[in-house]
Every structure is written in C-alpha cells, then in structure tokens.
Amino acid sequence: FFKGLDKPTIYTPELKKNISLTNFEAKEFFSDQKINSNELFTKSNFYLVNIWSSWCVPCRDEHPFLLKLQNENKVKLIGINYKDNKKNALKFIEELSNPFDKIVSDKNGTLSIKLGAYGVPESFLIDQDKKIVKKIVGPIDQKSYSKIIEILNETN
C-alpha cells in the first residue's frame, strides 16, 4: 500500500526526440508588433524557449538560472509571457532583469499549448534546425541548468 506514495502524482509525458517546432505568429512583447517564429529563430545554434508569467512563483526561482544562461552566450533565450498582465510582466522584468533576447506575448495561452506546454514555467531547448532537443517541465534548477550546459558544450 505505501509503495504507491513514492510514485509521482503529476503526469508529464516524455518528449519524443527530434520533434520539429511548428511555425507560429505572435506579438512581440514590448512593441505589440506581429512577429513570425522564423524571425525569432535566426543566427544561433541553440535557443531556449522559456514560458513564464509574473504571477508564477517558480518562474522567480528559475530566473537566476536564465540570467546565467544569458551570460554563457551559447544559447539565444526566447521568452513567452503566458496569460499575464503586461504591466505586471514589465514590473517582473524590471525587478529581476531581462535575460531574454526576445519576448512574445501569449495572452490566452494558445501558443504555449501549441508548443506542448502544460503550465508555467516550462522550457524547450531547440537546435538550429528547430528540433526540440530537451523539454524541462517546471523551473530550471541546478540539475536542469547543468544538463542544458552539457548539451550546449557537446555541440560547440
């Protein structure tokens, strides 16, 4: 009976390797101009797409790791601001600093769902061919940060 207590209760499906990211359109966070995914994914071997919100406490916890990844300069960071109030999101970035190269808005959550996200925060490591290499459900922590760096170092 007690063995069942050790099993995780949250179901997170495993990511199948080499799934290609589909093209999408979104609004650029700061300007509200429409932007195509082809414009986001240029001139980098790797991209980290991070889905976040100002109201998400674990998003605050992972923020220092996003800043560290920005400083590594081996990956382009793309933020997707999920179901958020723009004023609160701007305050979040102002307070904690902006690690992202680009941010797009996802006010109703459809873009995040299309990408295969189940909540916030979630992150996708994507290669230059727009293939998803790694999916991180939940906040980036030391373990997932180290795994991302390991993947980036294997190819550089």
Task: Locate predicted features.
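Short, ordered coil/turn segments that flank beta-strands lining enzyme active or ligand-binding pockets
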Residues: 29-31, 128
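Short active-site neighborhood of thiol/selenol oxidoreductases, capturing the structured segment around
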Residues: 36-60, 66
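Hydrophobic beta-strand anchors of alpha/beta hydrolase catalytic cores
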Residues: 48-49, 77, 123
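Structural microenvironment flanking redox-active thiols in thiol-disulfide oxidoreductases
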Residues: 60-97, 107-113
